[in-house]
């Protein structure tokens, strides 16, 4: 409903005007709402010259009266409240549907009408209910029984229920499993054996979900990958990997896989291992050039020698990476004497033809005191005076 801007829409009940008005349903999709009895047809998509604001006011009032509060934080409760409201509205308007000869309602009629509570149509509802309660024909009783049976019992289970969270449709009371309910399998938590609800031996051909080993066998994690010792080469590892696919699990790892190539160590449990079999490693020679804190660059002496021979033109690798050598480098301390003197490049302002000269502070200022106007430190306004002149 359109309204001017900066105005408030007030929905009120026009109690005083409803005494002389009639709201009745005639024909298909047509209602009568007028004191003179002239029919007002439902609005179509075409343009209308006049607008019945009183009818729109009643529509707004009735819609506000039938509306429910929706809370976005409690969607489930709001939808339940809406279902109860719609069920009460449609249950009260079922008697308005005209019935045919076979007892079924005509589908061409709308299922809900604008029905103000304080109108003559509301009074007609009460009178029709009172008549139906007093006088009931046999056909009416049969129709009510059919409606009651269709709304309750097994047919109620087959109705579609709307899921409140996901919006999916599901049928209540329908068995979804391919097997009957009496032949379903259940699992025991104590042991992993298969159990069946039925005692018949002829039903043993059903496909079992679990095996005889139980649930633990199904959920058992795979074994960890085999670890290849670091003493073996890449070619030996590839040979073991190829042979492991051709042998069973019991003989997948050979007994001498962890054996040192240069030593012969007995594998039997009862055999004694002599200490002389394991020779001591040779002592690390101390290089006086690198000092007592020198760290060998490798396990073998050959690799250490090869690394020592590879030097860069800027010096050794350790000297460039060590922070101590960087701090104590003499190259950084060569110009330390120059940093103790302050030098100034003086540009003469009065005579621009003279070239700038370099002064070392404070030696040159003390020696040439008379030449620079007798002021060693200068003044705050000396530079400004020279610029003004």
Curated annotation (Swiss-Prot):
Residue span of region Disordered: 119-156, 180-233, 294-321, 362-389
Biased composition (Acidic residues): 190-204
Annotated Polar residues bias: 137-155
Superkingdom per UniProt: Eukaryota
Protein name: Uncharacterized protein F37A4.6
Organism: Caenorhabditis elegans
Lineage of the organism: Eukaryota, Metazoa, Ecdysozoa, Nematoda, Chromadorea
